[in-house]
Amino acid sequence: MEEVRVRFPPSPTGYLHIGGVRTALFNWLFAKQHGGKLILRIEDTDEERSTQASIDGIIEGMQWLGITWDEGPYFQTEFADDHVAAAHRLLESGQAYKCFCTKEALEQKREAAMAEKKSEVGYDGTCRHLTPEQVQDKEAQGIPAVIRFKVPQRQGTLFYDDEVLGRIERAYSDVEDFVIVRSNGKPLYLLCNVVDDIRDRITHIIRGQDHMTNTTRQVLLYEALGAKLPVFAHMPLTLDLKKRKISKRSHGEVVAVQFYRDHGFIPWALCNFLCLLGWNPGTDQEIFSREELIQAFSLSRMSRVNSVFNFKPGDEKFFTDPKLIAINEHYLRSMDLAELGVLVRKELEEEDLWDAAYAADKEPWYLHTLGLIRDRFHTLKDFATAGRAYFADQYAIDPKP
């Protein structure tokens, strides 16, 4: 039986996003359930925006959450030669061609097509039928060129079977010849992604529905490169109450993993919450241990409709989704006291409230106190703020007016 191999390919151009973590989590669960492997691949081809700080944030965030990978991290830029070689193979086999159309010319054609209310405003194939002599002439003139994939001019539809959405079809005539290599010679994401997945022997691609336009094109690339098509599963997106995709631009730090780390959330509580955004076990159960979730997870239970992140900016009580706060409270109140003691210690140390005796002769008192007060708190931070009186040597009480 073929080994299950999935991947999480974040782009290191910013913080680790909870949407990205949800993707990593679902891939991790699927790999664990099937005895497979999760590959971490950093897609760092955007050299201007990629940063080492973002790479560190991705790795540290996943480690904090306990989402472990079996191979990697690999870096996409390390395999640039593979991507270029694949593009040349497609050129040589006649499945791709050089396009010398300028951006200005393409924009003029697009605007004209829109003005005439044409149904198709994509690339019109101007350079598709250039003769070798015409190509050589343009190259001799120093005219820059991109490389476009030559979409087969077939009747009917291209399709793939999606594990979440079922059979996905699109007419060949609706897919324009798309760019796979920029005029500077650098291959685009569409091609790089496929080449890397083929090399890494990826069997299942579990990702958001916002990638579906890419998938249609990538199906053609798999075929052209003579590779077996992986199984696709497109997850629903996570939107806010106004049906907007959650993002830092619209929602601020609340969508960053670091926000929850800084605010004293228990790592698995965040994972537990995220798995419920777009997936359900078919029962009323909402609290899962790692082992329970690995056993219960199934792509067949993935929702086809978008999930909602219930966040209201400016709400001081519910500074994130209330369900996430409730799940975190559950873990605070039910986890082993010794384990809780380790987590709270970090918070007390940050506030200079930690006493070394709490790990020695005062440990029974320390753990007993945590057991008495934990039902009042929402996050680990609360032990060092609202619970400060229990651990401070001196604590001033404001007199009532």
Where are these regions (language model features)?
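Active-site cores that bind ATP or allylic diphosphates and position pyrophosphate for catalysis
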Residues: 98, 102-234, 239-249, 256-257
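Catalytic adenosine-cofactor/nucleotide-binding cores of aminoacyl-tRNA synthetases and other
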Residues: 226-397
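Catalytic cores of large soluble enzymes that bind and process phosphate-bearing ligands
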Residues: 50, 75-79, 95-98, 150, ...
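Short capping/connector residues at structural and topological boundaries
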Residues: 13, 20-21, 47, 79, ...
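Residue patterns forming the tRNA-binding/recognition surfaces of aminoacyl-tRNA synthetases
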Residues: 84, 93-95, 128, 152, ...
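Alpha-helix initiation and N-capping motif
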Residues: 55, 80, 84, 103-106, ...
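Short, histidine-centered active-site or binding-site loop motifs used for metal coordination
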Residues: 8-12, 42-44, 195, 199, ...
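N-terminal Rossmann-like or analogous alpha/beta NTP/dinucleotide-binding catalytic cores
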Residues: 1-116, 213-227, 269
